């Protein structure tokens, strides 16, 4: 039953309600309620400019106060260049220190090796002296001693050990031990070699024992 304006007498009566319109209204209402609940549950949905905590606002102000309003692009570039120069200088210093460390370590390592080699050669000196005497008497021309002498000389050469002290060499008090000076002039040479000297590189293992004489006239 309807009124003169076309509206039903009782709009809420199920008989006067459009089922499709009612379903649409309920769905829209349910969506609005769900959106409202989600906004209430979300921490971001409740935030506003007036709800910022005093602690957060104070922290923001502190950060803003650290910004230099007079800093321009040129100032930033200059600061970066200064810092880059300082870091480059630090890198160069560290590189130089490392290079010096490596050189020092290498010298120490080589010194240890040379000391060990010198110790081995020192123990072989009596054998070397016997072989020199055998050579002077002609016993090293052939036979087992010749083979032994050649092998020992090769070993010493591999260790960079060399002998010195030959007749006619200029006398050097740093490496020659003079038993007697038979020279009559100012120029002194080795007249007789009583015992050869040996050195390892620049290190003298043993000085040569010699008699000083005059150089032979040519």
From Swiss-Prot:
Keyword Signal: no
PROSITE patterns cross-referenced by the UniProt entry: GRPE
Region Disordered, annotated ranges: 1-75
An annotated GO cellular component: cytoplasm
Organism: Corynebacterium glutamicum (strain ATCC 13032 / DSM 20300 / JCM 1318 / BCRC 11384 / CCUG 27702 / LMG 3730 / NBRC 12168 / NCIMB 10025 / NRRL B-2784 / 534)
Acidic residues bias locations: 48-75
Lineage: superkingdom: Bacteria
Annotated gene: grpE
Biased composition, class Basic and acidic residues, residue ranges: 23-40
Primary site of residence: cytoplasm
Protein name, as recorded: Protein GrpE
Annotated family: Belongs to the GrpE family.
Example GO molecular function: protein-folding chaperone binding
Assembly and interaction partners: Homodimer.
Assigned keywords, A-Z: Chaperone, Cytoplasm, Stress response
Compartments in which it is found: Cytoplasm
NCBIfam families attached to this UniProt entry: PRK14164.1 (NF010761)
One GO-annotated biological process of the protein: protein folding
Function: Participates actively in the response to hyperosmotic and heat shock by preventing the aggregation of stress-denatured proteins, in association with DnaK and GrpE. It is the nucleotide exchange factor for DnaK and may function as a thermosensor. Unfolded proteins bind initially to DnaJ; upon interaction with the DnaJ-bound protein, DnaK hydrolyzes its bound ATP, resulting in the formation of a stable complex. GrpE releases ADP from DnaK; ATP binding to DnaK triggers the release of the substrate protein, thus completing the reaction cycle.
């Amino acid at each position: 039953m309807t009124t003169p304006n076309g509206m039903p007498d009782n709009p809420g009566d199920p008989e006067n309600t459009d089922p499709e319109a009612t379903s649409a209204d309920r769905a829209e209402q349910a969506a609005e309620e769900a959106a409202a609940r989600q906004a209430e549950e979300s921490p971001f949905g409740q935030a506003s400019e007036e709800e910022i905590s005093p602690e957060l606002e104070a922290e923001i102000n502190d950060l803003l106060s650290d910004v230099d309003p007079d800093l321009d692009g040129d100032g930033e570039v200059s600061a970066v260049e200064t810092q880059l120069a300082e870091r480059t200088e630090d890198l160069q210093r560290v590189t130089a220190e490392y290079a010096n460390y490596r050189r020092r370590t290498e010298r120490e390592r080589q010194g240890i090796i040379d000391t060990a080699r010198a110790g081995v050669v020192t123990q072989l000196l009596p054998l070397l002296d016997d072989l020199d005497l055998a050579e002077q008497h002609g016993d090293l021309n052939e036979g087992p001693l010749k083979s032994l002498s050649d092998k020992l000389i090769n070993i010493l050469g591999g260790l960079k050990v060399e002998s010195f002290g030959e007749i006619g060499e200029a006398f050097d008090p740093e490496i020659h031990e003079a038993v007697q000076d038979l020279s009559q002039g100012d120029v002194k040479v080795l007249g007789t070699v009583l015992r050869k000297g040996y050195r390892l590189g620049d290190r003298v293992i043993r000085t040569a024992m010699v008699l000083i004489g005059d150089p032979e006239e040519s």
